[in-house]
């Protein structure tokens, strides 16, 4: 029996910058032997970044969505990345059309789950050029909060967004 697999990671600014070359396939060579560059053209986006770097896309979304960053430090979390997949047997059994539908449903689930929202997603790219199909979804963890004056704001906070490991169950 196959299972859906979801992995969530938090990334600092420097780590976020390093995500794009792998996710967006900017490089011509990769240390990951599972990447078959002859199949890279089969990869596709469910949300393509408008900018050519995740940092620029992040900055664009911050401005466009009027998000509050608070005080940033070297180890501040800028984005999270969810990788969604299953096992090879599952994808082989359902075929290409249903595989595409699977990732469309994953995207829909993530945009609606905990209010991630499409507007907070930097990129959602499906990789079909590796051994097992999977989607990388990079997003800004946004929560509704109040500023010091009591005004409602939307701020970036991975710790408040996830509220610890128990919030994954909800």
Show the residue positions of the predicted features.
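N-terminal nicking endonuclease/strand-transfer module with a His-rich metal-binding environment
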Residues: 1-170
């Amino acid at each position: 029996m196959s299972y859906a697999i979801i992995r969530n990671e938090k990334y600092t600014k420097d780590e976020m910058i390093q995500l794009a070359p792998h996710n967006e396939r900017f490089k011509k060579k990769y240390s990951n032997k599972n990447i078959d560059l002859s199949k890279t053209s089969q990869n596709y986006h469910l949300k393509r970044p408008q900018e050519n770097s995740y940092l620029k896309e992040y900055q664009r979304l911050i401005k466009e969505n009027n998000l509050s960053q608070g005080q940033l430090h070297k180890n501040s979390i800028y984005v999270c990345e969810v990788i969604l997949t299953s096992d090879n047997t599952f994808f082989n059994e359902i075929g290409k059309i249903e595989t595409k539908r699977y990732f469309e449903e994953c995207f829909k689930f993530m945009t609606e789950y905990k209010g991630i929202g499409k507007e907070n997603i930097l990129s959602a790219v499906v990789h079909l050029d590796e051994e097992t199909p999977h989607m990388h979804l990079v997003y800004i963890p946004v929560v509704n909060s109040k500023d010091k004056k009591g005004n409602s704001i939307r701020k970036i906070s991975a710790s408040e967004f996830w509220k610890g490991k128990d919030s994954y169950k909800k």
